[in-house]
Amino acid sequence: MNALSKAIMAETLCDELKLNKPVAKEMVENFFEELRHALENGQHVKLSGFGNFTLRDKPQRPGRNPKTGEEIPVEARRVVTFKPGLKLKTKIEKIGK
C-alpha cells in the first residue's frame, strides 16, 4: 500500500485543475500550514465530510522504563486526535467489504 504525500497531492492538483506545479505545491503547503496554525492556537479543525482534528490534554501518569523496570512519571501533554466523519467512515467500510 502506498502513502499519499504532499507531492502526490500537488501533482493531482496540477492534473485535475490544470495548475502549474509551483502554484499547486504552494496550495498544498498553505492548506497544511493553516491546519497546523489552527491546532497550535488551540482550535479544533472540522473538515466537513472528512473528519475532525481535536486537541486533548492527557494528565501526568505513572510509567515504567521497560529495560530497568524503574518507575518514571510520564509528563502531562497535549495530543492531536482525529475522528473520521460519517462520509469517510462509510466509504472506508465499503472498501473493506
From Swiss-Prot:
The keyword Transcription regulation applies. It comes from Legionella pneumophila (strain Corby). GO terms for molecular function: DNA binding; structural constituent of chromatin. Keywords: DNA recombination, DNA-binding, Transcription, Transcription regulation, Translation regulation. Belongs to the bacterial histone-like protein family. This protein is one of the two subunits of integration host factor, a specific DNA-binding protein that functions in genetic recombination as well as in transcriptional and translational control. GO terms for biological process: DNA recombination; positive regulation of metabolic process; regulation of DNA-templated transcription; regulation of translation. Pfam families: Bac_DNA_binding (PF00216). Heterodimer of an alpha and a beta chain. GO terms for cellular component: cytosol. Residues 50-71 are annotated as: Disordered. NCBIfam families: himA, PRK00285.1. SMART domains: BHL. Gene3D superfamilies: IHF-like DNA-binding proteins (4.10.520.10). This is Integration host factor subunit alpha. The keyword Cell membrane does not apply. PANTHER family: DNA-BINDING PROTEIN HU, INTEGRATION HOST FACTOR SUBUNIT ALPHA. InterPro entries: Hist_DNA-bd (IPR000119), Histone-like_DNA-bd_CS (IPR020816), IHF-like_DNA-bd_dom_sf (IPR010992), IHF_alpha (IPR005684). It comes from the Bacteria.
